[in-house]
């Protein structure tokens, strides 16, 4: 085999051919670029914006179609088990809200995990991590409001049983005299002509309110004493007969009517009559409807 001989002239000719080919390719590219730029110059801005909007709508529709495509159950379970970080979405976009399907899936999962509501008769539960207090709260022993206060009165403590109201009334009956004295003194202050000049309207109203509260307190205590006395007398006469609350109410009303003055009795009867008429009118209106 003879080795091929290349002359200097043949090599130069090849280089010239190669350079001419390159020049032609570059010239063609420049021509095509000029034509493209000329076409873009002729297109209006409105048509460009329309084309852009159309492309965006097409992209959205394609994304929706991709979402609507049902995946097999195995893939679904794998996706549910694997949760991507909160900053990156399924499409790889940053800081986007999760899709509605993902939210519905998570809400269903949470609803399944939620425990059922316990019965009110179930035993009370407490955390094992929380330390048990040395002073235990026993229901019925501690007062609701008095337990947190600084000072406690032993006489009214529930730990020593229920308070005997009759015994307390007998022990503190002397307070009625003080109450009546206070009412008379306050009435004198109001009747005085100098009170309007010396006292403000607010102070006068507070005195009136105090008189009213003291009077109502005295009246309630007197009514309670009367009820207890009537029940005591009835039990003394009828030992083997149990007194019902309705019978007790009737006996108390009768005793009150007997102790009333005729003018007071008329007022009470008139008030009851008006109340009864109001009830009847309400009943008529209800029946008409």
Curated annotation (Swiss-Prot):
Compartment(s) of residence: Nucleus, Nucleolus
Main location group: nucleus
Pfam annotation, one family: RRP36
A GO cellular component annotation in the UniProt record: nucleolus
Biased composition (Basic residues): 63-75
Entry keyword set: Coiled coil, Nucleus, Ribonucleoprotein, Ribosome biogenesis, rRNA processing
Record bears the keyword Ribonucleoprotein: yes
Region feature Disordered, mapped onto this chain: 27-149, 253-272
Biased composition (Basic and acidic residues): 99-117, 253-269
Ranges annotated as biased composition (Acidic residues): 88-98
Family: Belongs to the RRP36 family.
Assembly and oligomerization: Associates with 90S and pre-40S pre-ribosomal particles.
Identification of the protein by name: rRNA biogenesis protein RRP36
Taxonomic source organism: Komagataella phaffii (strain GS115 / ATCC 20864)
Gene label: RRP36
